[in-house]
């Protein structure tokens, strides 16, 4: 028989049991903690390892972007138009700068960098900062001056990083077509914007090992991915022809005091290639925010505050705009070529159809007359074009009819963008559709008023008039180039549609030559070359100045074998006349003669003009467009 425990033994087992219980509890908690840590370690090592690795690398490595050069741009004849130049960006790391030299650094660098000394000292005094920008894209001289100053005075913590910026070696040359880039080297306007994706290269990067405070380690780790230059462009623009156009336009703008800039376009009539394009005055794309036009600059300088800022912005946007592509205008009597071609093509008239021009003509209660109320009397269609007779073209438009007129207006590409590879084309021109066109609207549209189209649309349409009736898509880039100048892609001419019969085009060439030989285009004659053309002097119907005019002329040579077209428009000239045949025709003649000689087109005999043809410019038929409400 077993003995029961003694009271002393029982008392001893109670604390032992409590101890064992506590030990088991502690062991259990310890096991749970270990399990938790194990799970956490598993998460950190396996599931979250990539994230923490990235964080660690981000703290241990500093990446410095190495900017890629943009692709270079060349003219058709190999002139470099847009390239890249080295520059330097200056940054400071206040943590690394010696504290006893902050004031000296602020004073010296403020003087070199043309910055505020107080603001620099404030930046340098922020010891928490490891990176602050001092100056963006300075030239070599300024970068060298900063380097010399820091070395001479034992100033550390100033970083000089090499960078790249866009450079236009020809200055203002072709500025409105090329456009320019912003501080980030991204295209803002012109070809720089249109082809930005192609021109932009792929940046490189340098990875450098740093310590916990962001300082570069003495025994540094560094790896580099080299930048890749963007693709280049070869243009259809010929630098020589562009030079001829810009020189002639610049002289005309000054001579005739052109208030609202001038436009010039030279095209290959058979391909649609733009050989030259200018908006004058131009600007320097190396300094695009500096107003190049003296009058605009003086107007802005006379203002202050918000008014000055708004005026400056408007003036800058105006000088950047490629007027040849982006602006709409009333083409005036140059448009009579379109009306005439459409009427001939449909058979509504022949070149010998007769019309009468009296004192005036009334259409639905509105009375129209020719410039200076001239009476041309009875005349054929050819003579009406020579004389730029409004009354005759009102009658031609009526015979054509509004439906056919609107159909040809669209067929010539005057309702929609041309599709040129330049930005900022208007989405649509201003015109009447057949359902909105009454007799008065048809009458005024027939001689080139009441519709607004772009200068490029007008030039493109006239190319179709003379090249056999084919509407070609204008373009300015012929080749995409690789970094070594090799051709990656070639852009071929595009024919959008056939607008006229070949016979109609041939007849129009004959009539346009008659305009230059016997009519309002005599100032476009070129010795030894056969030239066809048409003048225009259009009212600016949306201008507050009732006397505001656009003097224009379009010329094609050689007209018997069409190759080159030149359109010149002077917007608001203030000269002895505003007639396009007097002001713009000589500019076309100068540009085309130089172009023909440069291209090796031989001179030949031209048809004789009548012996009595001894008129001066003042005697030329005027082509002003005028109508009065009855």
Language-model-detected regions and their locations in the chain:
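Periplasmic/cell-envelope proteins involved in peptidoglycan metabolism and beta-lactam response
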Residues: 1-303, 319, 328, 403-413, ...
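Beta-lactam-recognizing serine transpeptidase/beta-lactamase-like catalytic domain environment
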Residues: 2-10, 82, 211-224, 237, ...
